[in-house]
Design a protein with these regions (language model features):
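Short loop segments and helix-boundary regions at transmembrane helix junctions
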Residues: 35-120, 220-232, 249-253, 276-277
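Membrane-interfacial amphipathic/re-entrant helices at transmembrane-helix boundaries
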Residues: 1-28
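Hydrophobic alpha-helical transmembrane segments
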Residues: 20-24, 69-74, 96-100, 144-149, ...
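Helix-loop-helix "hairpin" substructures at the membrane interface of multi-pass membrane proteins
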Residues: 139-216
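Transmembrane alpha-helical segments in multi-pass inner-membrane proteins
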Residues: 202-258
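Cytosolic-side transmembrane-helix boundaries in multi-pass membrane proteins
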Residues: 257-282
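Transmembrane helix-bundle core of multi-pass membrane transporters
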Residues: 6-7, 102-159
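Alpha-helical transmembrane segments in multi-pass membrane proteins
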Residues: 22-30, 52, 56, 60, ...
């Protein structure tokens, strides 16, 4: 059985179709806001909020909640707002606040799971949460529809407020001077990133989420020069890498999250090489 025959065989299973749909949507959403975060030098906030999401999921597990997403989403959004507010406080700089909250949430989450978890395989559960697991291949139809709904909201927010996000990204001072509510749009960006991170936990795990946000944006910046082109290129690269990564992980039996990140890293290397060649050619 060749590769194409294997793909056709696996495509008959609903869980494979669900995984591809969700993976592509999460990759698309991550790439759209990734460009903004990289340009604003907020890349670390994705990593910080992913640790917070782990803490929220740990609390939901301890409370015996069958659906972790509502509580995890609420905790992550609340911390995104807190980090944004704290980052504007001159006493605690933004990067220090992110490090403090993320490390604290990660430590408390693991502590709670050790103290109160009834799982017989705690180490496996923690490892799966941190680095991703096969849970992306066991999605229910309701989870898929929830992901589709939230992804549509994220894309609509980005499209509807594109001009304002662009202005706040490149020159926040000028945006404020012309009447743009820069603080409000920064808050909107933080909330949307929190939603994306919670969605992405099933795909790549909490420790690898920032790769989905950073790698496509950095890869696109090696090839394109303006914001719109970088955003479109980032989206195409992110979706392509997610699709290839999920398919490769299914065929090779490797972890989904790590495989997607490995493909993203390879794409970044190729884009760097292509950027240098194009630069020399011009």
């Amino acid at each position: 059985m060749n590769v194409l025959e294997k793909l056709a065989f696996y495509w008959n299973y609903p869980f494979v179709r669900y995984a591809l749909i969700v993976g592509v949507l999460i990759a698309l959403c991550s790439s759209l806001l990734g460009v903004t975060l990289v340009l604003k030098r907020f890349s670390f906030i994705g990593d910080g909020l992913s640790h917070v999401a782990f803490g929220g999921m740990a609390v939901a597990t301890v409370l015996g909640m069958s659906d972790h997403m509502p509580l995890t989403l609420a905790v992550t959004v609340a911390c995104a707002v807190l980090l944004l507010h704290t980052g504007q406080n001159t006493q605690i700089k933004g990067d220090a606040a992110i490090a403090m909250v993320s490390v604290g949430a990660l430590a408390m989450g693991y502590l709670l799971m050790n103290l109160f978890s009834t799982s017989a395989n705690l180490s496996g559960d923690v490892c799966s949460t941190l680095f991703g697991s096969t849970s992306i291949l066991t999605l229910t139809k309701s989870e898929v529809w929830l992901c589709i709904g939230l992804s549509i909201v994220v894309v609509l927010v980005f499209v509807l407020f594109y001009n304002q996000i662009f202005a706040v990204t490149f020159d926040e001072t000028f945006a404020k001077a012309v009447g743009t509510n820069a603080n409000g749009y920064n808050l909107l960006i933080a909330i949307v990133i929190a939603v994306i991170i919670v969605l992405a936990m099933n795909l790549v795990g909490s420790l690898l989420i920032s790769a989905l946000v950073i790698f496509p944006a950095l890869s696109a910046m090696r090839l394109c020069k303006n914001f719109c082109a970088v955003t479109i290129c980032s989206a195409v690269l992110s979706v392509s890498c997610a699709f290839v990564g999920i398919v490769a992980s299914i065929l090779a039996g490797t972890p989904v999250g790590s495989t997607i990140v490995a493909v993203d890293m390879a794409a970044f290397g190729l884009c760097c090489l292509a950027g240098k060649l194009l630069g020399k050619a011009s």
